[in-house]
Amino acid sequence: MFTALSNLVMRPCLLLLALGLSVSPDASALQRGGVPGASMRSILLASPSAPNRLGPRQLWIGRSTSAIVTSIATPAEAVPGFIPGVGGLALVLSIVVEETQEEELFTLFVPSTPPGVERPMLVAFHGFNVSHLDIWANTSFISECQARGWFLIAPYMRNLAPTGPGTSQSGFGSAQSQLHVQAVMRYVMEGFPVDLDRIYGVGFSMGGGAAMSYAARHRDRDEGAFAAVVNHTGTVALQHVYANADNDTQGLMRRIFGGNPQYAPFNYNRSSVIELDANGVLVPDGDHMARNLSEVPVRTYYGVGDGQGYLVDEALQLDGFMSTISSTHELVALPADCSPAQGGHCWGTIDETEVCDWLETKVLGTPGQIGQVLADRNARWGNLDVTSTLAGVFSSFDYSISSSQNSIRLLGSSNLESVRFNLNEVGLDRSSPIGLRLGTADGSGDTVHITGYGGAPSSIVRNGWLVIEDCSSASLPRWCYDPSTDTLSITETAPQTALWTVNP
């Protein structure tokens, strides 16, 4: 299906040495024996000296990997493409992901910058049938980050449903593999001074689709929402990918997503950003997770003459969809710069310096005042905490927040149990009446939880009628203020749109 780089199938002990690390031959014995090294954070941040001046030091990572940290800048040849004398550390690390209790490998570059100075971070997603070392071996993103003083992480994106040797590195951006990416990002963000407003994603082929999906599914700044994404011919519509895949890849995708697209459409669509039918046509009103990217700068590249023509079609369909919801999407066509064996489908089509120059101009903005949310799980989307009525089904709604009118609208909701937001975060003023317009598409009714209200309101009116406080669970329009959590809850149960006014 995709160009395979068999020389990059994971062989940790051999490849770690190339990056300046030496792994203990019996990490499990170290784990059983409880031999602790200094933590990575204490080694790299406790001293004012730059990381490139550190000598070999014992490093204990997670619970399963022990390594020796050495400088990669002296000699610079330790990592191809490194800039002599600039400094920095390239590491291959392993953590145990709490949600799955399984190991995740990743490449990390730590810039040689003063301790405590926040720096941007690039998250690079590898392609099909290769590992996290794809970024080191086939791109210059590590040296670009070295030159700019950026952090870089390249996760393995481990697939826990492999169908054979080597297939654990091909997860197609599944929700499970994204849990592993999220764990890696948390690990680095908690241990290093990452600028949360300048985290960027980039990916090629399967990795391009994974980068886009991760961006669309993670819009919480505190969890590492991407400020911008570069998608290089990504697998952005997985039902369409399945229709064009070979038998082995289809078997792997069935294992990952719990069946074929007809049997498990939700699992495919939650890891896609647009929904295409088998003929490559955009599904009207489909489950397009790209709705969540209306204010995120996205640049999509494809190579003219790329042998994976259906992925070029996906790039064009993505551009068409994004043009209807956003002015921040760019489509760039370039001559494919690949070896004959790669069939025009390779990292080499893009210029890493140009990519990073473009990313460098982007900063995560405040969540938009108008937009759509398509949620595949209970999570925070911008300033809104969303809880679904049913798991395994998308929740959706349109929202509009107006500080000048001191109002918020949540309309067209489907499979929505509740939305929670903080009054100050969304820019509403408690000292004036607050208007809420609530309406559902499925007629099920919703609850809005407003935190930080600062005391019970004097009165609340619904459609011109006074509503008395009711903290029961009756199936009636009602409101309740909880002083213990300073939360005002308003529940609308009617299928028609209702206007609520909260008086201070």
Q: Predicted regions span which residues?
A:
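Short substrate-entry loop that stabilizes the transition state in hydrolases
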Residues: 114-119, 124-164, 239, 308
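Mobile cap/lid helix-loop segments that gate and shape the active-site cleft of serine hydrolases
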Residues: 134, 226-290
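C-terminal catalytic histidine-bearing segment of alpha/beta-hydrolase fold enzymes
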Residues: 299-301, 305-415
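C-terminal beta-strand-rich structural cap/linker in extracellular carbohydrate-active enzymes
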Residues: 475-504
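Primarily recognizes the serine-hydrolase "nucleophile elbow" in alpha/beta-hydrolase
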Residues: 130, 189-191, 196-248
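A domain-start/cap signature at the N-terminus of enzymes
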Residues: 30-119, 466-470, 476-480
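Alpha/beta-hydrolase active-site loop
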Residues: 171-192
